[in-house]
Amino acid sequence: MELFRGVLQVSSNVLDCANDNWWCSLLDLDTSDWEPLTHTNRLMAIYLSSVASKLDFTGGPLAGCLYFFQVECNKFEEGYHIHVVTGGPGLNPRNLTVCVEGLFNNVLYHLVTENVKLKFLPGMTTKGKYFRDGEQFIENYLMKKIPLNVVWCVTNIDGYIDTCISATFRRGACHAKKPRITTAINDTSSDAGESSGTGAEVVPFNGKGTKASIKFQTMVNWLCENRVFTEDKWKLVDFNQYTLLSSSHSGSFQIQSALKLAIYKATNLVPTSTFLLHTDFEQVMCIKDNKIVKLLLCQNYDPLLVGQHVLKWIDKKCGKKNTLWFYGPPSTGKTNLAMAIAKSVPVYGMVNWNNENFPFNDVAGKSLVVWDEGIIKSTIVEAAKAILGGQPTRVDQKMRGSVAVPGVPVVITSNGDITFVVSGNTTTTVHAKALKERMVKLNFTVRCSPDMGLLTEADVQQWLTWCNAQSWDHYENWAINYTFDFPGINADALHPDLQTTPIVTDTSISSSGGESSEELSESSFFNLITPGAWNTETPRSSTPIPGTSSGESFVGSPVSSEVVAASWEEAFYTPLADQFRELLVGVDYVWDGVRGLPVCCVQHINNSGGGLGLCPHCINVGAWYNGWKFREFTPDLVRCSCHVGASNPFSVLTCKKCAYLSGLQSFVDYE
């Protein structure tokens, strides 16, 4: 039998209106195994017993009803509340409220001096359906309360008649065998979709389920297999199925529920790397034509080494090294590669710097976090370290409070140093060491060709599927001791499938501090693009550097132009310091008297420990020094690409780029 449940609130004002019939009632209450009833507690016990007596001899819809009434004191205010559990052949959701209110108010009418009425609040689900779990509610909630919390209780349900007002039984109810409600009516046919509300132990589901539930389960599995996690992707993959489901309100709700379950399954129950691998390995055999492979080779990285690390990193198997940092100047493929990886995972979130109060609003419940060109402020540095290190934490969300964020892989793309922490108008490096311990950094220094195009999910799947199928040992050798800087390419350990692909241009240097095979002359300083030489907010020249060879063009190849500027224009257009002041010995550089060259530090004098052949900082200092010396003694010889053939001197004098290139500022000051 279905038993409905609800609550009646009895305020203290109702008891103030009690008449003599209520106070002087001779109703016998058995309190032999119960706490003594005094004052208003006795009034409520009399009232509850009077309602039960009337219900036993009433007719209409309440005839033959089972009931369980329990009155309790309010915790935070004066007064009482009555738990009502009842059900019968004539009761249904339509007449339940009217019948219960009529029964209690008819009895109350003869016990008060004023016209006071009680209101019944039935228990309902969030969808507006009535709870029908009265049996479980009695066993798991009402009968587990003991006197002082419970004022009085009455019932006509077998098994509870003698025990409902037994303090001894209630105190041992959790160990005693619970009685069951036995009726001739089969109560297993409850309406679908209504909550049972049980508090008992969770029992694994062993049933076969209904046809609708099996169909819904099949739909969720289909979404995961076809990598459909958004409504737009669903429309593209199977528009007919989406249209049929959207035609009804219940179908639209199924779409949202199925997508949520598919996302949960993909982010928590299935390794993320499975979505980055191609199902057909035969389609990934021509790996040398892959755009990502060409990009990484151009940046002087081994595509196999990077790919194996990405597969391990995306599955959260790198420990504290939970973050990939793509660092370099614009147009080098950083964001292109990061977004291609992000679009290949089930669902990704982005750190939003437009809202400084809630930058991590989109991080919770994602497979990957993309951090594009951001800064770390002192107010969020601790949360940022937890997220970058893959540690569980809580972040604030707008209009939602704080939510838990488990370890999620993070990929960062930036032109500046992300390890600097900003606090007001100051910048500190106190947290730099802790942040670097959570990252693996890849330097992107070679600009990509304009016709490279966007990297796609197919490129990522082809690249990573090929990497997953290779058994190359040099990744494990590096993974034993993770370093902050990702190791550069090793020609001896390069996979045979990659040997025929160009590795790096003649004018580029190792992005990870690798060894150069040729001695660098002073004239070649102006053709270098070195790490740190591009840290500027001022835009670079739009004119590309002409190529040094006529070989086949690939991702990082420079392009030709009819208007050619000075060969060092792009390389030297950098703000390493104030470009109009003279360099200071001991501050900006150290002079190597043996070779007659500037170096970055005393340790690199006479090529000990580095020098021009190994240290990129020494190369930067040399290019800076020679460029300054060249501009000082040739003030008006070099011009930008727009004024190469200009005859009007005022056009050159007013051009900021010409002033930077040829030292015209010092020339004007002198004149």
Swiss-Prot record:
Bound cofactor: record note: The endonuclease active site can probably bind other divalent cations.
Motif (RCR-3): 141-145
Keyword tags: ATP-binding, Covalent protein-DNA linkage, DNA replication, DNA-binding, Endonuclease, Helicase, Host G2/M cell cycle arrest by virus, Host nucleus, Host-virus interaction, Hydrolase, Magnesium, Manganese, Metal-binding, Modulation of host cell apoptosis by virus, Modulation of host cell cycle by virus, Multifunctional enzyme, Nuclease, Nucleotide-binding, Transcription, Transcription regulation, Viral DNA replication
Active site, renumbered: 141
GO molecular-function terms, A-Z: ATP binding; ATP hydrolysis activity; DNA binding; endonuclease activity; helicase activity; metal ion binding
GO BP annotation list: DNA replication; symbiont-mediated arrest of host cell cycle during G2/M transition; symbiont-mediated perturbation of host apoptosis; viral DNA genome replication
Main location: host cell
PV NS1-Nuc domain segment(s): 1-186
EC numbers: 3.1.21.-, 3.6.4.12
Positions of region (Endonuclease): 1-176
Record-listed a divalent metal cation binding positions: 72, 81, 83
Region described as Disordered: spans on this chain: 532-554
One cellular component term from this protein's GO annotations in UniProt: host cell nucleus
Co-factor(s): Mn(2+)
Alphabetized SUPFAM superfamilies for the sequence: Origin of replication-binding domain, RBD-like (SSF55464), P-loop containing nucleoside triphosphate hydrolases (SSF52540)
PROSITE patterns reported in the protein's UniProt record: PV_NS1_NUC, SF3_HELICASE_1
Biological function: Multifunctional protein essential for viral DNA replication, which cooperatively interacts with the viral DNA origin of replication and transactivates several promoters including the viral p6 promoter. Binds the origin of replication and performs an endonucleolytic nick within a conserved sequence in the viral genome, thereby initiating the rolling circle replication (RCR). Participates in the transcriptional regulation the viral p6 promoter that regulates all viral transcripts and the cellular CDN1A or IL6 promoters.
Recorded family membership: Belongs to the parvoviruses initiator protein NS1 family.
Name recorded for this polypeptide: Initiator protein NS1
Organism: Human parvovirus B19 (isolate AU)
